[in-house]
UniProtKB/Swiss-Prot annotation:
GO terms for biological process: epithelial cell differentiation; intermediate filament organization. Residues 56-367 form the IF rod domain. The lineage of its organism: Eukaryota, Metazoa, Chordata, Craniata, Vertebrata. Residues 364-404 are annotated as: Tail. Residues 204-219 are annotated as: Linker 12. One of its GO terms (cellular component) is intermediate filament. It holds the Pfam family Filament. This is Keratin, type I microfibrillar, 47.6 kDa. Belongs to the intermediate filament family.
């Protein structure tokens, strides 16, 4: 914005003491524009020498000074406006455009690390499953070992019971054998006593007496003993067979019970192992799901933190840009206000200049001479002032001044 005013006549007349006279219609009023120009500017006090009084000179000097101050202020505002435009241009050129940082490499690294973490977690889960399977196998073998140990203990208990029975049978056999031996000894003693008695009787009777007695035939003790032995042996054999049959039946029943119990135990153990495997598999899956959830929560937390940081950066950038925009808007509003003020000042100055120009042009025809000038605007010589302003003189057509 520039104000180029061409005021040759005004500058020329401000350098001398002459001043045009304002028409009588302007007397007692102020000139256009909010400059509060004194009303004495329009007073038409004319002296025959063409000079003005001191009040009019001071008013003219005041107006010229105000015009010069306005022009100086306009130039200063133009310089400030140019400086502000230059600063805005430099700032707009220096300010780098907003470029979002490229995080693709970091994202790729994060994805690779996440893949490695997932692979490690799957490998750990596989190893955990293998360890659990080994534990289950060891538990199975331990259960089988305990089962075999319990079966061995049962068989040993049965053997101990059978040994006790065998010992009892052995004792019973020994008792029976002792009884047989005692009976044999008693039989031998009886035979010896009988023979002694028979011999004694024979020796007493001699040959004199031959008594025949119809008596029952004598019993063969050997035969009786043999029969008794046979009976006892048959009884022992019968008892032994009965005991063996009872032992076999008890053993078979126990074996059946042990087999059924072992089958039930194996089925229960298999079911328990299957349930343990299922529980372990479910626990492993649950642990994997927990790990996946923790990983996803950590990823979500990291993503939220990263995006919150980016959001804070963007918000701070937005706040900075908004502050810069507000500053630019305030500068623009201030410059607009200054521009409006300058436009008003320009309008007032143009109005005043036009008024001054009209006044000067209207008064050029009334001035007899200019004591400070020797030529007019056309370059023609101006005649000297005369004391009688009523004498007719020749005027210059283009500039409307008197010549001689």
């Amino acid at each position: 914005m520039s104000f180029n005013f061409c005021l040759p006549n005004l500058s020329f007349r401000s350098s001398c003491s002459s001043r045009p006279c304002v028409p009588s219609s302007c007397c007692g009023t102020t000139l256009p524009g909010a400059c509060n120009i004194p009303a004495s500017v329009g007073s038409c006090n004319w002296f025959c020498e063409g000079s003005f009084n001191g009040n009019e000179k001071e008013t003219m000097q005041f107006l010229n000074d105000r015009l010069a101050s306005y022009l100086e202020k306009v130039r200063q505002l133009e310089r400030e406006n140019a400086e502000l435009e230059r600063r805005i241009l430099e700032r707009s050129q220096q300010q780098e455009p907003l470029v979002c940082p490229n995080y693709q490499s970091y994202f790729r690294t994060i994805e690779e690390l996440q893949q490695k973490i997932l692979c490690g977690k799957s490998e750990n889960a596989r190893l955990v499953v293998q360890i659990d399977n080994a534990k289950l196998a060891s538990d199975d073998f331990r259960t089988k070992y305990e089962t075999e140990v319990s079966l061995r203990q049962l068989v040993e208990a049965d053997l101990n019971g059978l040994r006790r029975i065998l010992d009892e049978l052995t004792l019973c056999k020994s008792d029976l054998e002792a009884r047989v031996e005692s009976l044999k000894e008693e039989l031998i003693c009886l035979k010896q006593n009988h023979e002694q008695e028979v011999n004694t009787l024979r020796s007493q009777l001699g040959d004199r007496l031959n008594v025949e007695v119809d008596a029952a035939p004598t019993v063969d003790l050997n035969h009786v003993l043999n029969e008794t032995r046979a009976q006892y042996e048959a009884l022992v054999e019968t008892n032994r067979r009965d005991v063996e049959e009872w032992y076999i039946r008890q053993t078979e029943e126990l074996n059946k019970q042990v087999v059924s119990s072992s089958e039930q135990l194996q089925s229960c153990q298999a079911e328990i192992i299957e349930l343990r495997r299922t529980v372990n598999a479910l626990e492993v899956e649950l642990q994997a799901q927990h790990n996946l959830r923790d990983s996803l929560e950590n990823t979500l937390t990291e993503t939220e933190a990263r995006y919150s940081c980016q959001l804070n950066q963007v918000q701070s950038l937005i706040v900075s840009v908004e502050s810069q925009l507000a500053e630019i808007r305030s500068d623009l509003e201030r410059q607009n206000q200054e521009y409006q003020v300058l436009l008003d000042v320009r309008a007032r100055l143009e109005c005043e200049i036009n008024t001054y120009r009209g006044l000067l042009d209207s008064e050029d025809c009334k001035l007899p001479c200019n004591p400070c000038a020797t030529t007019n605007t056309c370059g023609k010589p101006i005649g000297p002032c005369i004391s009688n302003p009523c004498v007719s003189r020749t005027r210059c057509g283009p500039c409307n001044t008197f010549v001689h």
